[in-house]
Amino acid sequence: MADPFASMASLKNQGLVIQKDNTHFLVERNFFISIMALRLASIKFDEAWYLSKYPDVRDAVKRRVVSSGRHHYVSFGYYEHRMPTSIHINEKWYLESYPDVAEAIRKGIYKSGQAHFELVGFGEGRLPYANFQF
């Protein structure tokens, strides 16, 4: 059977792929960021919502530190666990799937599953509903 990573030989020679095994490969940081930028540029993004939700980004755009909210999201926001658009959860599914969140709501730590998702759940990689995809 052919090595599925054989085509990566040239990437390794260029120093972009650092290490590989049968299931994983480690890539150079800037190479990873450039690959992620391509993927992140294609996801649903709401510029007005993002700038409203994140006033620090809005100010950075006004000061021309970044060219747009989308540019900020692709370059920084994703890695800071910021949401690219408003994402509404299925409350019932979310609380059934994450009983620790339901317990936190009962204890008064969060008002709702939606509040949890927006404050920490998105950053923790929790899904807002079954089969969610960007």
Describe the function of each predicted region.
Residues A2-F134:
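Charge-rich, low-complexity intrinsically disordered regions
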